[in-house]
Structure formats: C-alpha cells, structure tokens
C-alpha cells in the first residue's frame, strides 16, 4: 500500500458498492463503461471511499482476408458464410490475424459473383472458379466496429475479389 505520515494505506476495489473488495481491481472484458468502487483504509483513520470509471472502447476492425470456399453446383450462387472464414485487422490496435467468434457476426446476401465489363458484380452460379465473394456482414457484438466507417458502423456490404482463381469455386455435381 501507500503511506501517509508513515501510516500504511491499503487500497481495495470492487465492481459493486456493496460487493466484496479485493486488492486486485475488477476485470472487465467487454466494451462498455464500468464503475469501480474503491476504499482507502489506514490504522487510526476513517476509511475513504470513492468511484472512478473505466471505459473499454469497441475494437475497430477491417476485413483482411477470406479463406477458400467451394461448393457443389446447385443452380444457385448463394454461399453459406461463417465467421471462421474471415480474418480481420485493426490499424488502431496495430493487430493482424484477428478472428471473431461466430456470435460476433451475422451474414446476409452471401453469393459467388463475377465482375462484369462495367466493373459491377453479378451472381455467378455456374461451375468454375475465378469468382469473387459478395456479402453483407453485421456485427452482433458491441465489442467491435468497422474501422474507417462513420460513427461506429456495425454493418457493411463487401465484395472480396481475388486474383486466386481457385479461392471461390463451384464444382460439378455428381451424376445422378
């Protein structure tokens, strides 16, 4: 502890005003603002109490890469996309290879697409490779926001194009 006039002062902390106080501060892992309660106690002195706040900001992230995805021809360009297929980075945290839990993201409109002459992307349900992946992703966890987007955006539509002709493919269905 600290000392005042040679008297040792012991600081203890809790995440509840009427909770158990310990010498270790409370541990918070999710983004949000938290109140920490403290007590300063010393022999022959009245305890002093107070609070301070701890704020954990959401981690700003950007899409870094998408793993290979292949499916068997079913006449549709629709793709099942899961969080484990995506890798993110954060300029703010100077971190790469960030993997999000499945509970942190949801997807819609995930489709294999092909770039057209005008630069647009259209669904591409035919067999073969050389495709791009178009999708909308929504963050379902308050622990993340998309970096570089206004006001902590939690939904973005993206086209992930690659020079790897085998990254996104549709294979022929087995003959009946």
Where in the sequence are the language-model features?
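Short loop/turn motifs that initiate or flank beta-strands
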Residues: 1-176
């Amino acid at each position: 502890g600290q000392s005042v006039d040679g008297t040792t002062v012991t600081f203890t902390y809790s995440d509840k005003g009427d909770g158990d106080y310990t010498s270790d501060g409370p541990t918070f892992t999710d983004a949000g603002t938290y109140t920490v309660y403290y007590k300063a106690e010393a022999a022959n002195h009245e305890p002093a109490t107070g609070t301070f706040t701890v704020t954990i900001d959401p981690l700003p992230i950007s899409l870094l890469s998408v793993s290979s995805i292949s499916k068997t021809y079913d006449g549709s360009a629709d793709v099942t996309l899961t969080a484990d297929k995506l890798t993110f980075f954060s300029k703010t945290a100077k971190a790469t290879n960030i993997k999000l839990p499945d509970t942190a993201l949801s997807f819609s409109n995930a489709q294999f697409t092909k770039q057209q002459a005008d630069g647009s992307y259209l669904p591409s349900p035919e067999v073969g490779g050389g495709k791009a992946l178009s999708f909308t992703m929504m963050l379902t966890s308050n622990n993340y926001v998309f970096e570089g987007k206004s006001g902590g955006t939690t939904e973005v539509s993206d086209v992930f194009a690659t020079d790897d002709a085998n990254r996104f493919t549709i294979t022929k269905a087995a003959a009946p």
